[in-house]
């Protein structure tokens, strides 16, 4: 499995020209002080220099760094590497504890096991624009024999929705 790390600490000089931060290193340092970025002292240079943690940087800057980190990698012909890279990228947004938990869930239950921890079924359906009433309608339809479902759905062909919108519509048809 291919793996790579996204760098976590950046000095002001490395951040020059990045989106979301000033163009000059001195102004980046001022912004870091004003916004209280997490920093550590950098050793080996003249005077006092700091590196700033990626999680302290503006969102726009973090996205650019993470995007550049992925795009700097050679293009792979194997789909496995593409999936690996996307998974690594997604995991980079998690804390170390969340990463460990996600890896364990995937190891035990596969990627399907991870989904309920990310988003509930109700939230996923809501994101798709499926209302609670539509969910109830679907559950009612699923409980019926297939021939009855076909009969009910045939009544809605050519209509605006092509399906019963409310649970009561199904109950009336039964």
UniProtKB/Swiss-Prot annotation:
UniProt domain HTH Mu-type: residue ranges: 6-73
Induction conditions: Expressed in the early phase of the viral replicative cycle. When present at high concentration, negatively regulates its own expression by binding to O3 (PcM promoter). PcM promoter, and thus Repc expression, is blocked by Ner. The host SsrA, the ClpXP host protease that degrades Repc, the Lon protease, and the stationary phase-specific sigma factor RpoS are all influencing viral repression in response to either temperature or stationary growth phase. Decreased availability of host SsrA in growing cells would favor latency, whereas starvation would favor Repc degradation and hence induction.
Subcellular location: Host cytoplasm
Keyword Transcription attributed: yes
Single Gene Ontology MF annotation: DNA binding
GO BP terms: latency-replication decision
Keyword Transferase on entry: no
Residue segments, region Recognition by host ClpX-ClpP: 170-174
InterPro entries registered for this protein in UniProt: DNA-bd_dom_put_sf, Mu-type_HTH, WH-like_DNA-bd_sf
Keywords: DNA-binding, Early protein, Host cytoplasm, Host-virus interaction, Latency-replication decision, Repressor, Transcription, Transcription regulation
GO cellular component terms listed in the entry, alphabetical order: host cell cytoplasm
Gene3D superfamilies, A to Z: Winged helix-like DNA-binding domain superfamily/Winged helix DNA-binding domain
Pfam name, any one: HTH_Tnp_Mu_1
Homology family: Belongs to the mulikevirus repressor c protein family.
Subunit structure: Homodimer. Three homodimers assemble as a homohexamer.
Comment field on protein domains: The winged HTH N-terminal domain cooperatively binds to the enhancer/operator region of the Pe promoter. The C-terminal domain (CTD) regulates DNA binding by the N-terminal domain and degradation by ClpX-ClpP protease.
Main function: Promotes latency by binding operators O1 and O2 in the enhancer/operator region, thereby repressing the transcription from the Pe (early) promoter and blocking the expression of the genes required for replication (lytic growth). Competes with DDE-recombinase A for binding to the internal activation sequence (IAS), which overlaps O1 and O2. The outcome of this competition determines if the virus enters latency or starts replication. Makes the cell immune to superinfection by repressing genes expression of any subsequent incoming viral genome.
Name listed for the protein in its UniProt record: Repressor c protein
Organism: Escherichia phage D108
Lineage: Viruses, Duplodnaviria, Heunggongvirae, Uroviricota, Caudoviricetes
Gene behind this protein: repc
């Amino acid at each position: 499995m291919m793996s790579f790390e996204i760098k976590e600490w950046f000095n002001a000089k490395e951040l020059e020209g990045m989106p979301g931060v000033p163009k000059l290193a001195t102004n980046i340092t001022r912004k870091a002080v004003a916004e209280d970025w997490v920093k550590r002292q950098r050793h080996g240079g003249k005077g006092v220099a700091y590196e700033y943690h990626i999680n302290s940087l503006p969102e726009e800057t973090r996205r650019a760094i993470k995007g550049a980190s992925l795009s700097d990698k050679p293009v792979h012909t194997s789909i496995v590497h593409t999936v690996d890279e996307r998974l690594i990228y997604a995991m980079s947004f998690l804390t170390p504890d969340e990463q460990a938990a996600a890896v364990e869930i995937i190891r035990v239950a596969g990627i399907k096991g991870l989904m309920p921890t990310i988003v509930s079924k109700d939230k996923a359906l809501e994101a798709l624009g499926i209302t609670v009433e539509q969910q109830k309608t679907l559950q009612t339809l699923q409980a019926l024999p297939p021939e009855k479902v076909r009969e009910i759905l045939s009544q809605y062909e050519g209509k605006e929705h092509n399906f019963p919108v409310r649970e009561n519509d199904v109950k009336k048809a039964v």
